[in-house]
Each structure stands twice: as structure tokens, then as C-alpha cells.
Amino acid sequence: MKQIAVMLLLSACGFALDREAFTFTNYDLQIRIEPATPLLTATGKLRLRNDSASPQRAVVLQISSTLDWKSILLANKPVQYLTQPYTSDLDHTGELSEAVVTLPREVPPKGTIELDIAYAGAVPQDATRLERIGTPKDIAAANDWDRISESFTALRGVGYVVWYPVATEAASLSEGDQISETVGRWKQRHLASSLSLRVSLATSSAAAAPALVSNGTCGAAVAEPGRNSVRSTNCNWKSLGLEPPVLVAANYALLERPPARVYHFSGSEAAASDYANVAAAAAPLVREWMGELRRPVTIVELPAETTPFETGALYLTPLRVVDTKTLEVFLTHQLAHAALVLPRAWISEGVANFLQAVQSERQAGRMSAILFMQKQLRPLIEVEKNNLATAQKSAGQAQQAASNAATSLINTTDPFLASSKGMYVWWMLRDMLGDRPLQNAFRGYRADEDREANYTPRLLAAEAQVSAPQEAAHLEQFFDDWVYRDRGLPDFHIASVYARQMLNGGFLLTVTVENLGGAAAEVAVIGRAKDESDSRRLWVPARQKATIRIPMRSQPTEAQVNDGSVPESNMANNVVPVQSNSQQ
């Protein structure tokens, strides 16, 4: 009935409901968490901006379905609103409590409003959204572990449990990547949004006060006057879209061993020490590339049988026995975020993944790094295939160009594309330019100067002009194909190959490579003989051919294009045999 009432109200007012019309530019919230109950109560103020192209008469506010709206005020006066359940897997319950607020007057494009809000309710562990698509109960519980309880509290926010108000279209786990795309779109809209939060944590006694851990900038917890069993903390987030707020609370002990802070349960002291030691061992490589860390890596122990979670420099995980080298590669990701906070996902996540590959290379050589990256290659190929198919369905050239731009690295809301393709982009740039230009660009990055999408590419170009001027000539085309537009992936094959014996001894291997794909790249071309292997790098434009000659001491037997460091749509045709003095 409530949904019908909302529809009737909207029809009467003559407007359609655009759930994502408004961006929440600032949150100023006070929340109280009572683990024994387990209740969350919240009050505060929201500032919203109409980012749509049309005047808006309605505002949508959504919270987890186990929370209830208590009041919504505009200019200190109650406003008319209707609440309804809204099916969406952005919350662990599979449903949101949605308030559709009718404003007294339209808000024009770029106009702003402020609302005072209050809501409250329990936050139990709930895996309904996973169970209804057939996930076994134990696996569902291991993934959806957000809850408020006496022993452990965790609130991960949008995409897990919506404990602060949001406004999004519905998303379903049964619809492919719809959840990650919707969350990615929300993050993109809220990159410049901030949150000021006062958290009050009630405990059974002052002696048993749990530690509150978050990924925000928080002050010390202090007891409220006359209420020693309630401790309050002020926390701030400058960019909700970059690292959405996460809160965790339990009876943790803290091990501080730079660059790590490890919050652990009683009895996990040895494991906590191991994790801190591995973080310390992984840090020198990150400092070599990024400079000094700007914040510590925070590792928080989760209850057993739960799935790890990471965001930025925060890593939540059961403290299991893990292979040291594997953990070293994993923690390199958090260390990269601790060294450099960037507002662009393809850089922040791409660089973090790239440094994991570099750490793999440091441990076991280049092929180890390539194998690490190739774990993400198959899904990347599928994503690019789907993006190109969508673009090709566009009616005209302008629409296709717009589609290519929408799924480009600088614009994508797909976190997988930003991290996986971004990782490959940084590896290819390293192969083109060398280590030093990238390291200098990372160290020279200034967040307050990063106002345009080409800021980081300009830093790289300036460095490359000094140390690798020949390769720098290809940077503009590289960024156009791989970053500013989504041209898909290259598809290399060897069009012709022959070996000629030289008069002064040895052989000259001539290899012509054709790129059937839409993205240009510099790729390795390898000549092999019985007891010899040599490699040269060749720039191959999209849908063109290029030729390279490789001198070798003995008769070449095989030629290969791409050692796996360049992602391409088809690697099944990259190796051909070589016959002396004959063209293939």
C-alpha cells in the first residue's frame, strides 16, 4: 500500500522519481551503538545537491531495512515523506528502508538543501540477499558478517549494510556485476563528499570498553560526562567515494609496530606479530616507489570463518597462518594506499595492484609478476568484450565514442576494470619508460594540484622527456587508447618471420607483428634458439603492422610476440616456428 501511495503522490505532483538526482555533499551525524541491544540510533544533518539536469521536487533517503526513519526536517520544520521497503541487494538484508521526501518547492539543478534526520533500529547479522540466490548458509554468513553484537561490531556501509543514508537505484546480486557497478557509481558521485561523525559506544562497564577502529581520521575515545560506560569518538572522512566509512569494534589489543597497527583478539599475539613483521618486510619496496608512508597500515582481526575485506590502508581478516611471501604481496596493496591517497580509482587501485606485481617480481622474477597479473586477465577480457559490444550497438559514431569514453579508465565506475586494467597500464608504462620516471611521478604527485584527468599523465610525460624521450613520443597515443578511451585490448600475431645467416656469423631474425585490436602497445618480441633467447620491444599501433630485427648467435627456432605483460584478447596465436632463409 505504501508503494501505491508513493506512486499516487508522485503522479499528483507531476514528477518522476529520480533516485540518483541528489548527491550527498556532506554528512554531519551522531550515532550511538549499543552492542548489548543491539541498537543503532542516529541523528544529524545532510546537505544535498541536485546534480540532475532537471528541477527536483522529491528526495530519496535509504537506510538498511532493519532501521526505521524517526523524523525528517527541512528548515527545522517537518516535511511530508512516505516510507516504503525497497528491494535492493546493496544491503545485506536485501532490502532498504526508503523515505521519499516531498519538498515544498522544486530544487533547481545545482541547487542545495539541508535536512535534519533521525533514524534507529537493530543491526543483526543477516545474509538474506545471498541465501535467496542459493548461497549455502555457512558461506553466506562468512561473507555478510556485518552486525552489532556484544562480542563484535562491524559496519561496512553501502554495498554491505547501509548504516548512513544513501540514494541509489536498486541492484541485484543475480544481475551480474550490478552491485559493484551501482556502488562504483555511488563512489564516483561522492568523491568530493565528506562525513563528520561522532560515535558513542555504550558498554556494560568502563573496564570492558571495546576498541573502536575505523578508516577515518579519528580522535581519542573519551568517556561521556557522568556516563563512564559510554565512550565517544569524533571521526572525519574527506572523500566518501574514495574510501567509504567503515566502523569495527571489539575487545581488541593493539600491537603497534611501524608501518603496521594490528588490532587482535586475546590469544592471537603471535599471529599479530607475524602480520606486523611481514608488513615491515614489504614496506621497503613501497617506499622505493612511492616515498614515505603517509599513514600506517591498519590490520584488524575478524572472527574465524569470515571472509577478509580491505579498503584503502585498512585490512580486516582472521589472523590465519599464511605463506609469508603470499602475505607480503597482499599487504603491499595496503602499503601502497598508506603511501599515496589518490582520488582516481584507476591510479589508486591500479598502482596498488601494480606494486603487488612488482613485489612478486622482486621475490621470484618477472614471470612470477606476469602470472600474478594474469590471474585477472580472463575476466578483464570478458569485461572489455562486453564494453566493445555495447559501444558497437550504439546508433552512430558520436554515440559509440561516448560509450567508449564512459567505460574508459578515467570514467569507469567498475572497480574491477579500474584495478585490473589500471594494473596492466602501469606495468606497460614501466616497461616503456623504466622505473625512475614512474617513481619520480609518484613522489611528485600533489593531491591539491590534481584537478584534471591528465594531471598524472603530464607528470609522467615530463619525466619521460628526460630519461626516455623516444618512448615518450608514444605516450599520447598510449593514454588515448588505454586511459581516455576504451579501445578494447590489442590482439597480436606474427604476420611473418624469417631468419637470415649473416656473413660475419650469427643470424638476423626479422619479425613482423600485426595488431588486430583497437589499442596500440609496446610489446616484447622474443627470438629463441636451442641455447639462446633474446627479446626486443616493439611499438605496434592499433590495426597496423610493425617489424623488428633481432640479432642472434645461433639458428633461431621460434619467435614469440608478448611475454604476457600486455593484456590482449587472444594469446593463442603468439608463437610461430622459424625456418632459416624462408618466410612463414
Regions found by a protein language model. Give the residues of each.
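Zn2+-dependent metallopeptidase catalytic core
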Residues: G44, W186, H190, L197-P210, ...
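A surface-exposed beta-strand-loop module
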Residues: L67-A140, D144, V183-K187, E224-N228, ...
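Juxtacatalytic substrate-recognition/specificity segment
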Residues: V248-I347, V351, L355-Q359, A364, ...
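N-terminal, polar/Ser/Thr-rich
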Residues: C13-T41, K70, E476-W482
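Amphipathic alpha-helical substructures
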Residues: R294, T413-G505
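Beta-strand-rich binding/interaction modules
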Residues: S71-L73, A206-N215, A472, L489-H493, ...
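Acidic/His/Gly-enriched intrinsically disordered linker/tail segments
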Residues: E349-L433, A447-D450
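Extended, low-hydrophobicity, Ser/Thr/Pro/Gly-biased non-transmembrane segments
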Residues: A99, D116-E243
